[in-house]
Amino acid sequence: MSLPKLHVAVLMGGWSSERPVSLMSGEGVAKALESKGHQVTRIDMDRDVALRLAEAKPDVVFNALHGTPGEDGSIQGLMDIMGLTYTHSGLVTSVIAIDKELTKQALVPHGIPMPGGRMVKTADLYKADPLPRPYVLKPVNEGSSVGVAIVTAEGNYGSPISAASKGPWQEFDQLLAEPFIRGRELTTAVIGDRALLVTELRPKSGFYDFDAKYTEGMTDHICPAEIPDEITEACKDIALRAHRLLGCKGTSRSDFRWDDEQGVEGLFLLEVNTQPGMTPLSLVPEQARALGMDYSDLVEAIIAEALKDAGKA
């Protein structure tokens, strides 16, 4: 893929819990663009971001932010007001996709299989279990498994849950409780209007948490996943349908849990990530690489999608 030489502002950092990941993603993107001869302005997201974007006057903004405010519609709304062309999804899609409950409301009526569950106030956890054990607790709008916990039948956080157990959810006021789905972690990337591959993730710690995601050697990535063809095709179909239904742009990544004793009936979409990581260990670059697309070409492909959507390509 060949792009004209562009001035690209790379937005990274910010103040969410995923700041370290965003900085790694952003620096990787910036170096890739420079290797292709593009002019790059690095912007570490802060409260003066509008001024810095206005001063930079970029041809396009590469959004390498993760979490709030780069993934929840905030920065997208600002860039819309400023008339900037930017990568990845727009305001409405971002608002919906970062909220796991809103995502369910948008996708389940269209036949996308997602786990059941319910919203629960953190304070109510210490009164009674919201679901039969085992179940999963997760913040409604965090990524990278921040704040996620599996509550086991053995009472790993007490029975009932004890505030003294210092669960990772305690800094959040509201949580989503979902039934725990035994089985395997799968993920599928979409670029443009094409689902790539399916990767199976096998964390050596048993849980695919923040450290397992971003520490080299802590998770085995099997790409393409060694799973039945019908599961591969189901993952790709669901990922592409979810991408389209939510109105995602550029790239997205759909994460699944698969109970391999249940066949295709055991496959559930957990979430759609509209700002998937672009670090050396990240899954979208890995799948692209397995299909013969190197990292710098992937970055340019994402920018090309943004230019096309803006009518500039």
UniProtKB/Swiss-Prot annotation:
GO cellular component: cytoplasm
Name of protein: D-alanine--D-alanine ligase
GO molecular function: ATP binding; D-alanine-D-alanine ligase activity; metal ion binding
Catalytic activity, as annotated: 2 D-alanine + ATP = D-alanyl-D-alanine + ADP + phosphate + H(+)
InterPro entries linked to this entry: ATP-grasp, ATP_grasp_subdomain_1, D-Ala_lig_Van_CS, D_ala_D_ala, Dala_Dala_lig_C, Dala_Dala_lig_N, PreATP-grasp_dom_sf
UniProt record, GO biological process: cell wall organization; peptidoglycan biosynthetic process; regulation of cell shape
Cofactor: Mg(2+); Mn(2+)
Keywords: ATP-binding, Cell shape, Cell wall biogenesis/degradation, Cytoplasm, Ligase, Magnesium, Manganese, Metal-binding, Nucleotide-binding, Peptidoglycan synthesis
